[in-house]
Amino acid sequence: MTTQNQTDNQTTSRRSLFQAEFNNESLSNAEIINKRRVINGYDDGLMQVSPLKHPWAREIFKNMQRNNWVAEEVPFQKDKEQWESGALTDQEKDTFLRALAFASNLDGLLVHSLSEIIKPSITSPEVSLAIARQIYEECLHVDSYSVMIEAVGLDPEDVYGLYRRDKSLYYKNKRVWESMFKIKRHNFDTQNTEDAKLFLEACTTNLIFEGIFFFSAFLVFYNFGRHKKMPGSKEMIQFINRDEDLHVQLFVNIINEIKREQPELWTQAVQDKMAQNIVDAVQMEYEWGCSCIGDGILGITPDTLKEYIQFIGDLRLTAIGLPKVFNTKNPFPWIDEFTQGNMIEVNFFEGTVREYQTGSLEW
């Protein structure tokens, strides 16, 4: 016996799109657009973007295009000279390597999460376009870290292989991997309410990765730049940070749009789970950041690092409609000189971002 869910799946599945006989009385274009959703919507697989059902996704996609850059634009000669000349202390070198190690590991994991977990469930073509562009940008970041490693003259094993020697990084990567792929199973289907809730949780997980887990590393690189150290690395991170901020905006909009389209998913239990995941991520990022800076480095202390990560955590909570937990202020106001125009700290619901010039950090 065919269930209603099976019938619905057949009408929305790309696999069954052209299996039926031609019927010129099938859904009209307007009906197709009206049936679109971020997930569980009508999906003919033809990627017809216009007219738009989700204009915020197209806007983000266009801003991603305007941000286009390549790693070879960034000069690293000064970084190489400083690394080899003793301009950095042993502690500073260790902090630099640890920050670079996790950032490079995480971008690699994100490529898999987006392509294998998130994108297959998206049924809105304009949202799918933005996710595809994000996958490209994560690949660009992976390549950029490689360029940085080679240009500065670092041993790749010291960066990519650190998790095999460092217990804290190993377990952080392990927790990231497990949280990313908890929904990856053969019979996962967002038509099922519980699976749709898991997908919403997976989107929040990606928001955490993009919007919390990079930030102690970004802080380290910007702090080096503030002290006139490793300027090329700082510039590379500015490019990457600018991309990540749009990724954060994309997932905030995805989460909020799913809430609007399928409010039955946004139960109190789901809200509590999302909030706890963000709170746990803040603690995890703080612990990792402390392992990088030790008792403190170049003005960053464990206490100020904690305040900063908590400040970021509250931004992510409020962006998806959850209350603040930490109520801390940004203890590093100087960071604005490096992130001006690309740190997203305000109302995500407005769906607006600054426009940038291609291949430039001028805004």
Give the location of each predicted region.
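Non-heme di-metal
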Residues: 2-363
